[in-house]
């Protein structure tokens, strides 16, 4: 039998479940697949199949993540669920699972808890743009006033971290009851709530802009000269598209971007008219000397990205067991920061009131690089010391 072809008919969206430990994130994930399976839109996944998440490595960090896929009538979803709190922190900071939106699971019986707050803060810091709330364990709350109180608390908490708390959709239900019932009917008091939640996710979380529609950017991996023709920069197109004759800027490792024109494009030794996101290409650049471009710079659509030296970032510091440092670091710590294709040395400034950072911590820091790099909010990087990864980070704000 021939392999099933992936039919790209529905728009694709990446989401995940976030929230405090034991509030029912994994149960909800299992319930979603169970209810949608009844409509022929998903493969049912049991709780233990999701809970025993496989290990993955991202930027030298081991993370346990479960990936589940399912569809609604309108969309195709890739859904991530992590077993442990540390896995969420690592996942969100490394961008191992980029989320276009998240389902925040809060137990109606307990209300918001410390990790509820922490996950909302992380979502804000790393740029998860939309949150939909599922108040779980509603079967354990008899008092409607108590339900209202918990909902208000969650909305206030979201507003505190600059999410639109008043507008965020909130659905109350019981993931466990829906999982146990599994009828998948809309008029079922439990399964119906799961379907209502997915309707809200469909409506409220917008379809993201595709990489190919974003402005062109290609990290330079290698540079060589073709005698008689000029300098070629190679790399994988990260986003956007580029055609022969277009102007681009070389950005990074120098104070001001430098303009040039792409006079030729090649992929796998074949000539191209146009390259798009995901293509591994060589770009022939007009009037650029071999010494004027190097690995660590980027080619970009003019005016879309600038070189910067100072910025704020949310970082996760690896534990000793993860191959990280054995000791804390202090203000003025000078590791290397690995952006896209290269290491750059920089100085870390800790926030006021933070004396030191321990292995296993996540913290917001200020970084000053010794040389400018093409940086924008949301850019992921690794922190390295003598060639080994000791942490991971994401740019949250640019200073200069």
UniProtKB/Swiss-Prot annotation:
> Which residue stretches belong to region G2?
60-64
Assembly and interactions?
Monomer.
Instruction: Give positions of region: G1.
Output: 19-26
Compartment annotation = Cytoplasm
Record's GO cellular component, any one?
A: cytosol
The record's family statement is: Belongs to the TRAFAC class translation factor GTPase superfamily. Classic translation factor GTPase family. EF-Tu/EF-1A subfamily.
Segments of this protein annotated with the region G3 = 81-84
Name of the protein: Elongation factor Tu 2
Q: Does the keyword Plastid apply?
A: no
What function is annotated for this protein? GTP hydrolase that promotes the GTP-dependent binding of aminoacyl-tRNA to the A-site of ribosomes during protein biosynthesis.
List of residues binding GTP: 19-26, 81-85, 136-139
Q: Where is this region: G4?
A: 136-139
- In the record, what terms sit under GO molecular function? GTP binding; GTPase activity; translation elongation factor activity
Alphabetical keyword list: Cytoplasm, Elongation factor, GTP-binding, Hydrolase, Magnesium, Metal-binding, Nucleotide-binding, Protein biosynthesis
Which residue ranges does the record assign to the tr-type G domain? Answer: 10-209
* Annotated residues for binding of Mg(2+): 26
Q: What is its EC number?
A: 3.6.5.3
Q: Where is this region: G5?
A: 174-176
Q: What class of enzyme is it?
A: hydrolase
Originating organism: Carboxydothermus hydrogenoformans (strain ATCC BAA-161 / DSM 6008 / Z-2901)
Quote the catalytic activity from the record: GTP + H2O = GDP + phosphate + H(+)
Please tell me where this protein is predominantly located: cytoplasm
Concerning PROSITE patterns, the annotation shows: G_TR_1, G_TR_2
Q: Which NCBIfam families match?
A: EF-Tu, PRK00049.1, PRK12735.1, PRK12736.1, small_GTP
